[in-house]
């Protein structure tokens, strides 16, 4: 298999790209305070209420055979999960409760829209 020199080649690079994309969107676009964490989660997000959320970022660059993007939450018990669809440069945000304990989430490309991203980010301000 030949690799494109501009495409990340390993899961760590893909994950790191997603973390930076999520941090950019949450900090620069919405003004939330972000800290990168290397440990039990990927980011800490400080809400205007001063509540700190533990954030796990999951990234995908290649759709499945059905055309959807698949995200695995691993063993994380973060407060929220940010799913980054790198090819579309869009994110979706879900709380632990919304995922209902499922370890894998599959999202169609149509579920990644600018409106959905904006609504998800706005929802953080209600927490």
Predicted features, each with a name:
Residues 14-23, 53, 60-65:
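Short, basic/low-complexity N-terminal boundary segments at the transition from targeting/disordered tails
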Residues 92-94, 98-127:
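Non-catalytic C-terminal interaction segments of nucleic acid-processing enzymes
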């Amino acid at each position: 298999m030949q690799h494109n020199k501009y495409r990340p080649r390993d899961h760590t690079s893909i994950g790191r790209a997603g973390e930076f994309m999520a941090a950019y969107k949450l900090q620069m676009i919405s003004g939330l305070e972000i800290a990168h964490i290397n440990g039990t989660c990927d980011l800490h997000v400080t809400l205007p209420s001063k509540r700190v959320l533990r954030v796990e970022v999951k990234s995908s660059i290649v759709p499945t055979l059905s055309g959807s993007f698949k995200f695995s939450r691993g063993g994380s018990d973060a407060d929220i999960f940010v799913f980054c669809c790198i090819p579309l440069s869009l994110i979706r945000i879900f709380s632990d409760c919304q995922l209902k304990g499922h370890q894998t989430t599959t999202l169609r490309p149509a579920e990644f829209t600018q409106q959905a991203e904006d609504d998800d980010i706005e929802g953080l301000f209600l927490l």
